[in-house]
Amino acid sequence: MEYTVNQLSPVKTQVTVSVPAEEANAALASAVAMFRSRTDLKGFRKGKVPSSVVEQRFKKEIVSEATTDLINVHINEIMGELKLSPLSGLDVSEAALTKGEPLEYTFSFEHAPAFDLPEYKGQAVEEEDVVVSEADIESVIERVRKNLAEVKPLSDNRPAKDGEIVSVTFEAFEDGKAIPGVRAENFELTLGEGQALPAFEELVKTIASGNEGEGDVTFPADFINTELAGRTVTMKVAVHVIKERTLPPVDDELAKKAGNFENLDKMREAITMSYKKSREDLHRSSAQKKLLDSLLATLDFPLPPAVVEQQLGQMVEEFVGQLERRGKSLESTGKTLADIQGEMRPRAEELVKTQIFLSAVALKEELTVTPQEMDAFFYRLSTQAGQDVIMLKRYYEDNGLMIMVRDKLLCDKAADLIYANALVTKVAPVEKPAGEEAQD
């Protein structure tokens, strides 16, 4: 076997392979022998069927298997010599071995471009320090109270107030005609928590339980559904039920219900530790991304198109899945698939560029991923997804996704290595707008 390499672009290579007749004959003979050993035909003992009969009976299957096996052997050998790792699937030309004849075929693949790594160790970066205030702790306790609150329907037919839960059916109209996609039945929301447009909530608060009402609502100019952005519509609303939330007192009993804590002080200690740890992780992640962004800004190299498209496809699929889980469709956003792809493409390109950079760092640092680290990844994933870890791992194996997982873990290790060798300066935390901390 001989081959020639043609660099189609900085990120794509084509290999042309020439197979002499002798090698083709050997591959076919090996396939015939394998088929002969497992063939069971009436009139012959198993494994004793004449080769000529086997060739005649299974000619198509023999040629297919011999060709596939030989090409796979060649590709593994060639890729090892080229020291290139495909970032996308290999595109192999059609080929079929013929007895006594040479064979030529090609395969192409996308890979990382060649580039010089910047100095990634000893880089300066600022990381926000963590300060846990009393207000932070109180906001968490307030969320605990809301989660453990007693909720019951109101008996009197009055309009709802902030903090109360309403169940409504609504529909939007314009010039007397219903607007498609702007309708919901038995929609439940808590007033005063920003779960709906302020104008819509104000309208709901004018309608008593069991009654209907209508009013004009103007959608903001930056509304997610671009077809509704900036438009004023007539919203017809029916309020079915109003529920009152009674918060439990802040005492030792609350602590026991919240997490079987011994008393309120123990719960506050646990909240403080958990809050501090989550903020430390958040600030570290933010600083790490800032450091990576600064390193990536010094690099300029082409990206493999197929890899970008694959990343973009995954992101769009995840976005559409999130919409569907919320009972919405892509059409409900007022955007086309092309619109979403256009908005997400820069992020997809950024992710691919980051992956290529971190993979190069991992290679230079000779980082590896152990089987135990792979198992730990699937354990965490199964816990998050609520799925059996063995079945989840088998799915990844059956769908050829294990290399993707390994590469992700390698990139994570490379990012951690860069940050571990950075010159980190702690700075005072940036003050956030009121209420934003409570959302973390």
Curated annotation (Swiss-Prot):
Which InterPro entries does the record cross-reference, listed alphabetically? PPIase_dom_sf, PPIase_FKBP_dom, Trig_fac, Trigger_fac_C, Trigger_fac_C_sf, Trigger_fac_ribosome-bd_bac, Trigger_fac_ribosome-bd_sf, Trigger_fact/SurA_dom_sf
Primary residence = cytoplasm
What is the stated purpose of this protein?
Answer: Involved in protein export. Acts as a chaperone by maintaining the newly synthesized protein in an open conformation. Functions as a peptidyl-prolyl cis-trans isomerase.
Query: NCBIfam families this protein is in?
Result: tig (TIGR00115)
A GO BP annotation: cell division
A GO CC term? cytoplasm
Q: What is this protein called?
A: Trigger factor
Can you say where in the cell this protein is located? Cytoplasm
Supply the domain comment: Consists of 3 domains; the N-terminus binds the ribosome, the middle domain has PPIase activity, while the C-terminus has intrinsic chaperone activity on its own.
EC number(s) in its UniProt entry?
Answer: 5.2.1.8
Q: What HAMAP family does the entry give?
A: Trigger_factor_Tig
User: What is catalysed by this protein?
Assistant: [protein]-peptidylproline (omega=180) = [protein]-peptidylproline (omega=0)
UniProt-recorded Gene Ontology molecular function terms: peptidyl-prolyl cis-trans isomerase activity
Its keywords, alphabetically, are:
Cell cycle, Cell division, Chaperone, Cytoplasm, Isomerase, Rotamase
User: What region holds the PPIase FKBP-type domain?
Assistant: 163-248
| Segments crossing the lipid bilayer | none
Task: List, alphabetically, the Pfam families matched.
Answer: FKBP_C, Trigger_C, Trigger_N
The family note in this entry says: Belongs to the FKBP-type PPIase family. Tig subfamily.
